[in-house]
Structure formats: C-alpha cells, structure tokens
C-alpha cells in the first residue's frame, strides 16, 4: 500500500504543477496580446522615422556622400572595423524555453567570429538571464542593466545609449550591433542582428518601406546638413534599441506561452501514465488480498 500512497502523492503533485503552468500560459497569452499591440504601434513610428531619414537624405543626394561629415554615417563597405560593441537583450526571467539560450548562443557565435578576424569585442548586456550567464562564465560585460527588457522604458534607453554613443563618437568602438530574439508570430521567434552604428548610407533601403497608404512625410531641413543628420541619428539609435526591447518582450511572452503549454500537456500525459500505474498497483493489491483470503479459507477446511 505504500506504493499506492506514493503514486497518489505524485499524481497530486503533478496536477498542482499542471494548474500552475496552465495559469502561467494564460498570463503569458494575455501579456502577449498587449505586447503585440505595442509592437505594432512602435513599428509604425519606426517606419515614419525611416521615412524622415529617406526624405532628408534624398534632399542631400546631389551633394555626394563624401560631403557628409557626420560621424554617425559611414560607407559600411569601406569602413575598417577593429572594435565592436555587442548589445544583447535577454529576459529577466526564465521558464521560456530556449528564448535566452538561443540569444546567448548567437552572441557567443558573433564574438568568436569577430575574434577570428582580430576584432576586439565588448559586450553590453540588457536582461538578468544573459548577464548572469556571462558573469558565471567569467566573460566581461561592460554595461549591465536588468529590469529593462521586461519593462521597456525610453528614458532608461536614452541613458543607456548615451554611453554607447559617447564611446562610438570618441573612437572607443567602430561598430555597434544589437542581438535579440525577435517576435515573428505567435509560435515563432527569430534571432535578429542589427547594426545601429555606424548608420550605413543605404540603411533606409534595408528596412521595410511604409505602405502606399501611409502618410507621406515632408520636411524642410533647417540648419546644417550634419546637424540635421546628427539629430536624426541620435533618435534613430535610441529608438532602434527601444524597438528591439519591445520586439524582444513580445517574443519572450510568445516563448513562455509555448513553454507553459508544452509543460501543461506533458503534465496531462504524466497524470495519465501515473493513473494507469496506480490502477494496476491497486488491482494487484486487490488480487493479492483475494488470493490470501482464499488461501486462508482453504487452510481452515
């Protein structure tokens, strides 16, 4: 009977876990819907920002690329890269499948790829899970910030990017990229790598263009061309990180929803298996008792 008691306890424990994972799935589903809406609105703003870039650059096209002196802009094909800063985004929490692991693997792969080319790499981390991983493995992370990937905040992004931009403009780094796990759809996430500094002259054509129904933006630049581009570039790099955080958060909720759904289904299967084992053990116990009773009756005859 001790075996039956153990199985009953296991069934009860698994059912409790099943309730928890199901509740977490529902919470993640709700958060995902909200995150999707924020991502759509943010994407609309990003497209408008791209349109402003396109408009300003088109007005300057007759000047020639060599006339643009802004340090934010470079011809990427001709740029000699010796130092790279990688900004990675992971979640602050776990229980989201391979969401964090896939991002970390990509960061390590990019780091090794650059080092093979004798390019110095510095890491800047956003998200507790990624920061903990690199700290545990003795890998230096220049800047660490937690509780931002779970709660994107533009003011904190500006503060974080201020150091990044200062290092870039002062020549401490030649290139800045963002690596994060992005939202593709309800069941799919994809690793995204984006160069935010320097801004290539063809950067606008690398991004999806506004639809034909989207409002056309017209602008008349005031001030020097470089001042205009610098002002736009600052907003561009800040919003690139902010949008990556929003995109990452939507992907995180999607990954957690799937992970909890899988855990719930596995719990259901385990309950079925344990129930079968319980019924078999119970039947064996009943059979054993009947045999013992019959044996006792026969002994009394």
Swiss-Prot record:
Taxonomy, superkingdom: Bacteria
Q: Does the keyword Transport apply?
A: yes
The UniProt keywords, alphabetically, are: ATP synthesis, Cell inner membrane, Cell membrane, CF(1), Hydrogen ion transport, Ion transport, Membrane, Transport
Q: Name one GO molecular function term.
A: ATP binding
Q: How does it assemble?
A: F-type ATPases have 2 components, CF(1) - the catalytic core - and CF(0) - the membrane proton channel. CF(1) has five subunits: alpha(3), beta(3), gamma(1), delta(1), epsilon(1). CF(0) has three main subunits: a, b and c.
Enumerate the subcellular locations listed in this protein's record, separating them with semicolons: Cell inner membrane
An annotated GO cellular component of this protein is: plasma membrane
Q: What is the lineage of its organism?
A: Bacteria, Pseudomonadati, Campylobacterota, Epsilonproteobacteria, Campylobacterales
Protein's membrane topology: Peripheral membrane protein
Function (record text): Produces ATP from ADP in the presence of a proton gradient across the membrane. The gamma chain is believed to be important in regulating ATPase activity and the flow of protons through the CF(0) complex.
Disulfide pairs? none
Q: Per its UniProt record, what InterPro entries does this chain match?
A: ATP_synth_F1_ATPase_gsu, ATP_synth_F1_gsu
**Could you give a single Gene Ontology term from the biological process aspect?**
proton motive force-driven ATP synthesis
Family (UniProt): Belongs to the ATPase gamma chain family.
**The name this protein goes by in its record:** ATP synthase gamma chain
């Amino acid at each position: 009977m001790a075996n039956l008691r153990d199985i009953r306890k296991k069934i009860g424990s698994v059912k409790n876990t099943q309730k928890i994972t199901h509740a977490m799935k529902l919470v993640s589903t709700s958060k995902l819907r909200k995150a999707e809406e924020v991502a759509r609105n943010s994407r609309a703003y990003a497209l408008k920002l791209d349109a402003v870039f396109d408009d300003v650059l088109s007005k300057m096209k007759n000047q020639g690329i060599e006339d643009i002196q802004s340090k934010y802009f470079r011809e990427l094909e001709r740029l000699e890269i010796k130092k790279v800063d990688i900004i990675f985004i992971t979640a602050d929490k776990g229980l989201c499948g391979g969401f964090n692991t896939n991002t970390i693997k990509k960061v390590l792969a990019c780091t090794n790829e650059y080092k093979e080319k004798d390019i110095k790499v510095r890491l800047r981390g956003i998200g507790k899970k990624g920061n903990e991983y690199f700290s545990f493995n003795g890998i230096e992370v220049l800047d660490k910030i937690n509780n931002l990937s779970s709660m994107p905040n533009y003011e904190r992004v500006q503060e974080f990017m201020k150091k990044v931009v200062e290092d870039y403009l002062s020549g401490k780094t030649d290139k800045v990229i963002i690596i994060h796990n992005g939202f593709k759809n309800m069941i799919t996430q994809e690793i995204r790598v984006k160069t935010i500094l320097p801004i290539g002259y063809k950067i606008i054509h690398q991004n999806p263009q506004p639809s034909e129904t989207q409002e056309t933006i017209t602008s008349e630049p005031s001030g020097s061309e470089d001042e205009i581009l610098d002002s736009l570039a600052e907003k561009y790099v800040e919003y690139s990180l902010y949008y990556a955080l929003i995109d990452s958060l939507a992907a995180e909720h999607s990954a957690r929803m799937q992970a909890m759904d899988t855990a719930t289904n596995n719990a259901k299967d385990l309950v079925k298996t344990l129930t079968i084992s319980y019924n078999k053990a119970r039947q064996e116990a009943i059979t054993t008792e009947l045999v013992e009773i019959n044996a006792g009756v026969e002994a009394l005859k």
